[in-house]
Swiss-Prot record:
<dbReference type="InterPro" id="IPR013246">
    <property type="entry name" value="SAGA_su_Sgf11"/>
</dbReference>
<dbReference type="Pfam" id="PF08209">
    <property type="entry name" value="Sgf11"/>
</dbReference>
<keyword id="KW-0863">Zinc-finger</keyword>
<dbReference type="GO" id="GO:0003713">
    <property type="term" value="F:transcription coactivator activity"/>
</dbReference>
<keyword id="KW-0156">Chromatin regulator</keyword>
<protein>
    <recommendedName>
        <fullName>SAGA-associated factor 11 homolog</fullName>
    </recommendedName>
</protein>
<keyword id="KW-0010">Activator</keyword>
<feature type="region of interest" description="Disordered">
    <location>
        <begin position="61"/>
        <end position="84"/>
    </location>
</feature>
<comment type="subunit">
    <text>Component of some SAGA transcription coactivator-HAT complexes. Within the SAGA complex, participates in a subcomplex of SAGA called the DUB module (deubiquitination module).</text>
</comment>
<dbReference type="GO" id="GO:0071819">
    <property type="term" value="C:DUBm complex"/>
</dbReference>
<keyword id="KW-0862">Zinc</keyword>
<keyword id="KW-0804">Transcription</keyword>
<dbReference type="GO" id="GO:0008270">
    <property type="term" value="F:zinc ion binding"/>
</dbReference>
<feature type="region of interest" description="Disordered">
    <location>
        <begin position="133"/>
        <end position="182"/>
    </location>
</feature>
<feature type="zinc finger region" description="SGF11-type">
    <location>
        <begin position="98"/>
        <end position="119"/>
    </location>
</feature>
<feature type="compositionally biased region" description="Acidic residues">
    <location>
        <begin position="148"/>
        <end position="158"/>
    </location>
</feature>
<dbReference type="GO" id="GO:0006325">
    <property type="term" value="P:chromatin organization"/>
</dbReference>
């Protein structure tokens, strides 16, 4: 490999590189070739870079993002009304309403589950309330929840006797079954 091939030349030190550079730059023909080479390389790289960017923008659809959205021809008007922002949009939060399938009432979404539970009588207190209703309707009216007096004469036979009180059992540790000590 000779020095003039231009493929790869190694220099011993920096001083030798500087001497070789000065020797090439002292010749006007070599300077012109080097300047033309640098100029053409810069122009080629710039054109190729722009071509790749345009191609990529068209392929990915990001060309509109580079160009931006066209400006509106009419200027924005500032709206000064209650419950609206400066552009006229409503700024109040609208609660989502649900329709109760049981009573056909409109209930806020945040209250729908508790409403439905009470409306259908499925809540935790519903069994107590139902027991109270049964007791109240039994006391009022005919005396029988189901509406008939025909079973009243049979009730005296089995419910007339007083029940005997259970004797509480004492455990081996001296405490009663309900937890109280004797």
């Amino acid at each position: 490999m000779s020095e003039n091939d231009g493929i790869h030349i190694e220099y011993v030190d920096e001083q030798e590189l500087k001497r070789e550079f000065r020797r090439f730059m002292s010749d006007p023909e070599t300077r012109e070739k080097a300047a033309n080479y640098l100029y053409e390389s810069l122009v080629d790289e710039t054109i190729l870079g722009i071509a790749y960017e345009v191609h990529h923008a068209n392929k990915t659809g990001s060309g509109a993002a580079v160009e931006g959205e066209p400006e509106d021809s009419k200027p924005y008007t500032i709206v000064d009304q209650p419950d609206t922002d400066v552009f006229g949009s409503s700024n109040t939060k609208k609660a989502i309403d649900c329709h109760c399938p049981n009573c056909n009432r409109i209930v806020a979404a945040s209250r729908f589950a508790p409403h439905l539970e009470k409306c259908m009588g499925m809540g935790r207190n519903s069994s107590r309330i139902a027991s109270r209703r049964i007791a109240n309707t039994r006391d009022v009216g005919t005396g029988n929840y189901f509406g008939g007096d025909e079973d009243d004469e049979d009730d005296a036979d089995w419910s007339g006797e007083k029940r005997k009180k259970k004797i509480s059992q004492v455990r081996t540790n001296g405490s009663k079954k309900n937890g109280k000590t004797s």
